[in-house]
Amino acid sequence: MAQVINTNSLSLLTQNNLNKSQSALGTAIERLSSGLRINSAKDDAAGQAIANRFTANIKGLTQASRNANDGISIAQTTEGALNEINNNLQRVRELAVQSANSTNSQSDLDSIQAEITQRLNEIDRVSGQTQFNGVKVLAQDNTLTIQVGANDGETIDIDLKQINSQTLGLDSLNVQKAYDVKDTAVTTKAYANNGTTLDVSGLDDAAIKAATGGTNGTASVTGGAVKFDADNNKYFVTIGGFTGADAAKNGDYEVNVATDGTVTLAAGATKTTMPAGATTKTEVQELKDTPAVVSADAKNALIAGGVDATDANGAELVKMSYTDKNGKTIEGGYALKAGDKYYAADYDEATGAIKAKTTSYTAADGTTKTAANQLGGVDGKTEVVTIDGKTYNASKAAGHDFKAQPELAEAAAKTTENPLQKIDAALAQVDALRSDLGAVQNRFNSAITNLGNTVNNLSEARSRIEDSDYATEVSNMSRAQILQQAGTSVLAQANQVPQNVLSLLR
């Protein structure tokens, strides 16, 4: 080996080994201080990617476990509200059993019904106000999806149902004794002013078109004559002047005659056939037998009130009265009877004018329409029958944009048939939902247990890849420290080797 002083190869070799031991010492200290075997991707590129996927899965499962606990909480909140509803239903059933006893007086039944109504109102309040984190759990049918896994589609659904007196079928529950409804046909001398001259001046073109719906031509009463059918006690006129598409509207129409001789054409009038025996009349006919005229006026009044013309056929004016459990007769007002249905009405005994009581409401298209007030519907209470055929209880009118009317009062309460059966069905409905909520809580508990086990196993697997083995790292640190000390000492010796060349220069 040549003796040189410009390059000290032994010193360079010693420095290189010293750097290696210093790097090993730094790595060992970093791992011991952080607790991690992988502090950056350079420590273990593949291991870092695997450990990161484990971390994402572990964090997702941990959050899923918290979600499942939220699911349990909302199910418990809902089930607690249902328990209160169940308590109210049990009391309602108890009261219904009490009401079935014939020893109860009418006042007893009224008191029982009052408490039942309050209990049902409380059920509605609980249904409308119970919420979890802003979600009303019983106010409407709803499905809540709870994420119980770290990946898409790993969910459990909570099916919530609207539970109130209406969905339970108890909104019209009534245990009061039914009233016996009676009606007495009203017979009146509709036109008493015999000799009054008939006046058709009101049946001008505008009035006729408004009543018949025609628009083409100039309509008028042919000859200005009114004809009277003595057999049916009806008045008729012949209308002409319609042209074009409305020419078919020319013909005979039945008209109404007031006591002052005024002749009017009912709204929605349709063409009819005048009896062959009808004769021209210039004066009001005094009628001795008036039911047919009353019936015609009643029909027209119902049609004006929004009732279908077919349903209004055969309508008659009747006086209503009710007999309670104690045999007391309660006089009611007038009604228009059409088949087995009754509609509230006003009747002017002086003039014979008949008018159906109506309620205005806003239809789905935003237009204001008129509906007749039907008495004694399926639940025994006043109902509103709209022009589109839908029927609403008066008590629910506010929910359908009806304008309040004093006529919408309870007419005749009808006792609910088989009330205990209806209440039992309601209890079964509540029990079914409570069972579903109990079952889903058990599912959540099972999911939480499984999530915990999975998180533990994944954490152990990640630890084997990512965490420091302190026994190994302490050993590595000790070895590196010894090598550092030895390397430093040897480097000092190696740096002295070039001085040997000086002995050759002496």
Swiss-Prot record:
Q: Which domain of life is it from?
A: Bacteria
- Tell me yes or no: is Secreted among this UniProt entry's keywords: yes
Q: Under the GO molecular function aspect, what terms does this record hold?
A: structural molecule activity
Pfam families, A to Z: Flagellin_C, Flagellin_D3, Flagellin_N, FLIC_barrel
Please give the Gene3D superfamilies that the UniProt record associates with this protein: 6.10.280.190, f41 fragment of flagellin, C-terminal domain, f41 fragment of flagellin, middle domain, f41 fragment of flagellin, N-terminal domain, Flagellar export chaperone, C-terminal domain
One cellular component (GO) term of this entry = extracellular region
Cite the InterPro entries for this sequence.
Flagellin (IPR001492), Flagellin_C (IPR046358), Flagellin_C_sub2 (IPR042187), Flagellin_D3 (IPR014981), Flagellin_N (IPR001029), FLIC_barrel (IPR049365)
Location of this chain's protein in the cell? Secreted; Bacterial flagellum
Q: What does this protein do?
A: Flagellin is the subunit protein which polymerizes to form the filaments of bacterial flagella.
Q: What is this protein called?
A: Phase 2 flagellin
Identify the coding gene: fljB
